From Swiss-Prot:
Keyword Metal-binding on entry: no
Binding site for substrate: 7-14, 20-21, 59, 86-89, 97, 113-114, 182-183
Pfam families named among the record's database cross-references: His_Phos_1
Catalysed reactions, as listed in the record: (2R)-2-phosphoglycerate = (2R)-3-phosphoglycerate
Site (Transition state stabilizer): 181
Residues the record marks as active site: 8, 86
EC number: 5.4.2.11
UniProt keyword terms in alphabetical order: Gluconeogenesis, Glycolysis, Isomerase
Protein name: 2,3-bisphosphoglycerate-dependent phosphoglycerate mutase
Family note: Belongs to the phosphoglycerate mutase family. BPG-dependent PGAM subfamily.
Taxonomy, superkingdom: Bacteria
Length: 227
């Protein structure tokens, strides 16, 4: 069995080196090109999908659409879920990473970005950009909508969707594409690869590059590689 992850193509805020999180930004021109190249590469290598899963953020949805279009599979059903959203970076969202490091120190920013269980400064619920004010999340209980997350909390958010939707799809024989975000994919990778809390800090997933997992019947990883 195979599973394909793809992190969205470069976003406009990736290009500007800003913390993004749940803020909804578009793909950059480079990001659009990365998504198109990924779709063509998947087609060239014979990858076909029966179902695709993505987040409710534009950059991931757009990447999913482009990948499927460029691989002549735009008909493939897509399921969008907030559970595959990027990690919520709290009050860091919209800030320049370099300037934030100059203010708080490189080590503190590294911990905020990469540690497994350290939360960023939380966003106020009445902030203009709070997810509590976004109709995408209006159906969710208020205590479920995050104001900031670490990777541990992100995994706790993503894991129920893996267990309820993605894993059963794979086990039923469906060929699955997951188009999501750096940290939601890192969280899933931690789970399926059994990566330790310490080692996950070093895992980077590049934008717009298909990551293929070969899995056994128990969804244990046999092999993984980038196309």
């Amino acid at each position: 069995m195979e599973l394909v992850f793809i992190r969205h193509g470069q976003s406009e805020w990736n290009a500007k080196n800003l913390f993004t999180g749940w803020r909804d930004v578009k793909l950059s021109e480079q990001g659009l090109a990365e998504a198109a190249a990924a779709g063509k590469k998947l087609k060239e290598n014979g990858y076909e999908f029966d179902i695709a899963f993505t987040s409710v953020l534009t950059r991931a949805i757009k990447t999913c659409n482009i990948v499927l279009e460029e691989s002549d599979q735009l008909f493939v059903p897509q399921i969008k879920t907030w559970r595959l959203n990027e990690r919520h970076y709290g009050r860091l969202q919209g800030l320049d990473k370099k300037q934030t490091a100059e203010k708080y120190g490189d080590e503190q920013v590294r911990i905020w970005r990469r540690s497994y269980d350290t939360l960023p400064p939380l966003l106020d619920k009445d902030d203009a950009f709070s997810a509590h004010k976004d109709r995408r999340y209006a159906h969710l209980p208020a205590d479920v909508v995050p104001d900031g997350e670490n990777l541990k909390v992100t995994l706790e958010r993503v894991l129920p969707f893996w267990e309820d939707q993605i894993a059963p799809a794979i086990l039923s024989g469906k060929r699955v594409l997951v188009a999501a975000h750096g940290n939601s994919l890192r969280a899933l990778a931690k789970h399926i690869e059994g990566i330790s809390d310490e080692d996950i800090m070093g895992l980077e997933i590049p934008t717009g590059q298909p990551l293929v997992y070969k899995l056994d019947d128990n969804l244990k990883v046999i092999e993984k590689f980038y196309l």
